[in-house]
C-alpha cells in the first residue's frame, strides 16, 4: 500500500490523534501498520520513545519497531527541525530518513508518517515537509481545525500540495 503522510495547517492541531486513529482502524482490519515520525521536537527528556506522540502512535499501531528507525531525528527543543538542528549543531540527513522509511515499508503493509508543524515547516534550509512528502511519494491527509483563520490556512495548504 502507498504510505500515508499526516500533516496539518499548524502545530498542535491533532496530527497524532488522527494518525493513531488511522493506525488503530487499519490494525483492526488486520493490516500490518508501521508508524514513523521522522522528526520530533520539544520534549525535554528522552525516555523510551522520544516523544509522547511516538508512544501514542506505537500503542495504536501495536508495533515495537526500533526507536531510531521510527524517529530518526529527535530534538529536545521546541522548534522546527531546521532551527533545532542548527541550534544543537546537528546535521539532518534526509537520506537517512528515507532509509529508515524504506526499512519500515519493507516489513509493514502500510506506513503512516506523521509530520511536524505544517507542510512548509523547514527541515533543511531549502527542504521542507512538503518536499519530504513528495520524496516519500505518500498520499497526504491534512488535519485542520475549526478556529477562525483556518479556512485560509487550509486553502493555502491545499494549493501548495496540489490537491
Please tell me what each predicted stretch does.
Residues 20-89:
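N-terminal phosphate/diphosphate-binding loop that engages ATP/GTP or pyrophosphate donors
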Residues 11:
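The conserved Walker
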Amino acid at each position: 500500500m502507498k504510505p500515508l503522510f499526516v500533516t496539518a495547517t499548524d502545530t498542535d492541531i491533532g496530527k497524532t490523534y488522527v494518525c493513531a486513529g488511522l493506525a488503530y482502524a487499519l490494525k483492526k482490519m488486520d493490516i500490518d501498520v508501521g508508524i514513523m515520525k521522522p522528526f520530533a521536537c520539544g520534549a525535554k527528556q528522552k525516555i523510551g520513545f522520544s516523544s509522547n506522540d511516538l508512544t501514542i502512535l506505537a500503542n495504536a499501531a501495536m508495533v515495537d519497531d526500533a526507536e531510531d528507525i521510527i524517529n530518526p531525528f529527535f530534538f529536545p527543543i521546541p522548534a522546527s527541525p531546521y532551527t533545532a538542528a542548527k541550534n544543537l549543531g546537528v546535521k539532518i540527513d534526509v537520506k537517512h530518513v528515507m532509509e529508515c522509511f524504506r526499512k519500515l515499508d519493507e516489513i509493514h503493509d502500510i506506513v503512516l508518517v506523521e509530520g511536524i508543524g505544517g507542510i512548509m515547516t523547514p527541515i533543511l534550509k531549502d527542504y521542507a515537509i512538503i518536499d519530504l512528502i513528495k520524496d516519500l511519494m505518500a498520499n497526504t491527509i491534512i488535519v485542520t481545525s475549526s478556529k477562525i483563520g483556518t479556512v485560509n490556512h487550509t486553502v493555502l495548504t491545499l494549493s501548495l500540495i496540489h490537491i
